Regions:
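Generic enzyme active-site microenvironment
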Residues: 8
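Extreme N-terminal starter segment of soluble prokaryotic enzymes
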Residues: 1-5
Length: 240
């Protein structure tokens, strides 16, 4: 085989994992829940075996979609071995490197980040301070703290249930290049805490109408060992 395409529909689950409750995801079955609430027209995916894979995973047919039909692809349903539920864990495992050690997570406290981390980030990046320092929804926190950020120049830092350190900043007032440089510094600092990703969350727009832009960038820890893509030793083109 001279060329292969690996397509990932991230977060489109076809059945809940046995440990879903551990992560607050009991009852998760994303594709089934979507199919139960609206009509899906996905003939090509069904021919490739998506419906059959969903049935294999949960023992139930997808609502509103044919339970049988001609399948032109090979299909299967896998159960994740990795200890985490985040994006890098799943992607690495699909590439042959499951994550068998726990990621570092930040507590649901305010502040949620240790002072040694935030103090070092402020000093290294010459910042006037930080806003947020909590668990939050990305869209909600820019609506809440966006004005204070623009006025003060303090970036917004927050986390979630995943192993992430997220930094939001206004593309015009703070600058996209400066935000990305800040995230590179943060990536170095959070390595000590075994955090999976630092995520740049740029936003734009006027007060009251802040919107996240498409310039998000993820800074992930490298896989702990070579993936299948490394072992194939070929040219890799990544999109997305």
């Amino acid at each position: 085989m001279s060329r292969a395409f690996v397509l990932v529909m991230d977060s489109l689950g076809i059945g809940g994992a046995a440990d879903a409750e551990k992560y607050g995801d009991a009852g998760a079955d994303t594709l089934r829940h979507i199919a139960a609430t609206r009509a899906l027209d996905i003939p090509n995916l069904m021919r490739l075996g998506l419906g059959a894979a969903a049935h294999l995973s949960s023992g139930k047919a997808l609502p509103g979609l044919p339970a049988s039909g001609k399948i032109s692809g090979a299909y299967g349903a896998a159960r994740e071995k990795s200890l985490g539920k985040d994006t890098p864990s799943g992607h690495w495992e699909m590439a042959g490197v499951p994550v068998m050690t726990e990621w570092g997570y930040f507590p649901r406290t305010e502040p949620c980040f240790p002072a040694t981390l935030t103090d070092a980030l402020i000093a290294r990046a010459d910042l006037p301070g930080l806003l947020g320092n909590c668990h939050a929804s990305g869209t909600e926190i820019i609506a809440k703290l966006g004005d204070a950020h623009v006025e003060s120049g303090k970036p917004i830092v927050y986390t979630s249930a995943d192993s992430v350190f997220q930094i939001a900043a206004h593309e015009e007032s703070f600058g996209l290049a400066r935000l990305l440089e800040l995230c590179e510094i943060a990536r170095e600092l959070v390595d000590t805490y075994n955090v999976g990703r630092v995520i740049a969350r740029p936003f734009d727009g006027p007060s009251g109408s802040y919107v996240r832009t498409g310039n998000r960038r993820d800074y992930s820890l490298p896989p702990p060992e070579p993936t299948l893509l490394d072992r194939f030793d070929g040219k890799t083109v990544s999109i997305g």
